[in-house]
Amino acid sequence: MFLRSVNRAVTRSILTTPKPAVVKSSWRVFTVANSKRCFTPAAIMRNQETQRVGDILQSELKIEKETLPESTSLDSFNDFLNKYKFSLVETPGKNEAEIVRRTESGETVHVFFDVAQIANLPYNNAMDENTEQNEDGINEDDFDALSDNFANVNVVISKESASEPAVSFELLMNLQEGSFYVDSATPYPSVDAALNQSAEAEITRELVYHGPPFSNLDEELQESLEAYLESRGVNEELASFISAYSEFKENNEYISWLEKMKKFFH
């Protein structure tokens, strides 16, 4: 399902006065003695704070592991992956997720999305109910809340030969609607130009012309591109998968983050 529009030193100086050698020596002894008396409590305080952070991290880690649904595993996503012949590209330690499929016509479809962004999208159940009851769809009071529910999804489709052109579609996915809005369609001279993740390649992609706003295109062209994407598996089921997998991966990444933090503070 596709949507057509989105309203978018201290500077300090210290003066010292020369003092007799005997007095200076006495002052140093006094200072060292005091510093020794203060050091131990300060060290204890630091150790206590370190231990406190470690204990909290351990507690949070325990809670997260205990509340993990037993049925949640990568296997739970196999129905969708097998149906559309998508393969999951595992990216441990990264926000970005990727799934890939090869079509019967020899095209390769890459779908990229940010699991942290999607897992933290607000979801307003009340607004969802209001939308269902409103025959005209979303009213003005709900529009601002709805616009906060969009996440970026990038779909890159390439031909069989690596030297052939590729097209990158920048999409906005709405969690509540299970729908996609095409923001732009950008052609590239090769797969490498579209997918290379080097800093130089990313800068080049930022500078390239991305075409006019999708909504400014001829309506028939819009419809045909949307139908093309749907035929490649960009549909409500993909939106549901992206939402569910993002929750799964983001939670696993959070547990991994807690474990790494705990190692430092313990």
From Swiss-Prot:
Domain of life of the source: Eukaryota
Transit peptide feature range: 1-47
GO MF term set: mitochondrial ribosome binding
Any one biological process term the GO annotation gives: aerobic respiration
Keywords: Mitochondrion, Phosphoprotein, Transit peptide
Coiled-coil zones: none
Phosphothreonine PTM sites in chain numbering: 91
Any matching Pfam family: MAM33
Subcellular location: Mitochondrion matrix
GO CC terms in record: mitochondrial matrix; mitochondrion
Family the UniProt entry places it in: Belongs to the MAM33 family.
Miscellaneous: Present with 4910 molecules/cell in log phase SD medium.
Subunit description: Homotrimer or homotetramer.
Function field: Not known. Binds to the sorting sequence of cytochrome b2.
Protein name: Mitochondrial acidic protein MAM33
